[in-house]
Regions:
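Conserved catalytic cores of soluble enzyme domains
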Residues: 1-119
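Short amphipathic alpha-helical patches
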Residues: 4, 67, 90, 110-111, ...
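A sequence-level detector of short, solvent-exposed, charge-rich linear segments
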Residues: 34, 69, 106, 122-130, ...
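Acidic-enriched, low-complexity/disordered segments with a strong bias for Aspartate over Glutamate
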Residues: 48, 74, 79, 129-136, ...
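Terminal amphipathic helices with adjacent charged low-complexity linkers/tails
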Residues: 95-156
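Non-catalytic terminal/interface segments that mediate subunit docking, oligomerization
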Residues: 147-194
């Protein structure tokens, strides 16, 4: 019945309104652990971070059967909107995990770096690195020639606390490294060219 379709659209509008109202106020993290299709896929795209599980989660507006009917093209759920597609091509997902348990662990780790709301500071963690720690790698890694490349992952690992780095969108724009780390126990954002 047509009125049920209208009610569904109204429900989506309410969800999107809540996404917008919460934006910049609380962290919004979408965990996609199974199929997500139709209007429901817009909400994860509006959240701050999205995680998908490999092989079990899919996000697309219209599934493979409709694509086949309309275009004649055979496409799998994975190729249409699987975790690897959204991690490497569309950029909609920020993290991928092999299992749901691994996905939840990544979300917990992410939450350890960011404030719970816009009125709080990011969590401060006791730093176990010595305050006067020196890493000779930093004296050697950057080559004398400005045209010779070097690995920014090594630089990042050498300067952050305990080498702990949570990379965001690691499969998207491979020339760019973004993520979270800590320096002296304080959360920092990292942006680097690779």
């Amino acid at each position: 019945r047509i009125q049920e379709g209208i009610n569904a659209l109204s429900g989506y509008a309410e969800i999107f309104q809540r996404n917008i109202m919460a934006s910049g106020v609380i962290p919004q993290i979408s965990g996609i652990f199974g199929p997500c299709a139709g209007g429901a896929v817009y909400s994860p795209a509006l959240t701050d971070f999205t995680l998908m599980t490999e092989g079990t989660s899919y996000m697309f507006l219209t599934g493979p059967a409709v694509v086949k009917t309309v275009t004649g093209e055979d496409v799998s759920q994975e190729d249409l909107g699987g975790a690897s597609v959204h991690a490497s091509k569309s950029g909609v997902t920020h993290f991928t995990a092999e299992t749901g348990e691994e996905g939840l662990a990544i979300i917990r780790k992410l939450l350890s770096f960011i404030p719970q709301n816009n009125l709080e500071e990011a969590p401060l963690v006791n730093c176990t690195d010595p305050i006067d720690r020196m890493d000779d790698l930093l004296n050697e890694i950057i080559p004398d020639s400005p045209n010779k490349p070097y690995d920014m992952y090594e630089v990042i690992g050498a300067i952050i606390d305990n080498g702990e780095f949570l990379e965001v969108q690691k499969d998207y724009a491979k020339n760019l490294i973004i993520g979270f780390a800590r320096m002296n126990g304080q959360s920092v954002g990292v942006v680097a060219n690779q």
